[in-house]
């Protein structure tokens, strides 16, 4: 199970991947200074740190509200979601296109073609993913963080 939760008072997003805890921090918070700390409260761009190297960012996850796009940038790869007005969100990973079908209840399913590869639930500043294939765990952990950043952004905008 993957669980991403925003810790607002700490200004971080914790991502639990099995027993490990990954940490997402706003990029502005890393630069110091009061102005940057204030800007970090409204950030839509986060660095993700894994327990193996807690001081070196593993990836950058950002959200663009204007086009409803979650962007994931690792050292090797880059992925971004594509949204449509009435259709599902899509994302390409490993040469495969996945579709994300969301419900108004916060539940969603990630499909490869017509086969479900993961199911999720959005909560208040949180995202939980279950029933996924092990080889997708790292990718889905990044996506879970992106969903929490998306939720936080819409809280600020809406």
Task: Enumerate the predicted regions with their spans.
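Intrinsically disordered, low-complexity proline/glycine-rich segments
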Residues: 1-158
């Amino acid at each position: 199970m993957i669980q991403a939760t925003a810790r607002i008072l700490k200004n971080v997003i914790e991502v639990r991947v099995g027993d490990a805890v990954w940490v997402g921090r706003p990029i502005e918070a890393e630069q110091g200074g009061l102005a940057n700390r204030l800007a970090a409260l409204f950030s839509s761009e986060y660095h993700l740190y894994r327990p193996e190297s807690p001081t070196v960012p593993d990836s950058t996850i950002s959200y663009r509200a204007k086009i409803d796009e979650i962007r994931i940038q690792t050292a090797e790869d880059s992925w971004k979601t594509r949204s449509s007005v009435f259709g599902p969100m899509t994302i390409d990973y490993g040469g495969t296109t996945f579709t994300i079908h969301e419900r108004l209840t916060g539940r969603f399913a990630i499909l490869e073609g017509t086969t479900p590869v993961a199911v999720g639930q959005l909560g208040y500043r949180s995202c939980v993913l279950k029933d996924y294939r092990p080889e997708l765990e790292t990718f889905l952990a990044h996506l879970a963080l992106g969903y929490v950043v998306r939720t936080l952004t819409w809280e600020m905008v809406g």
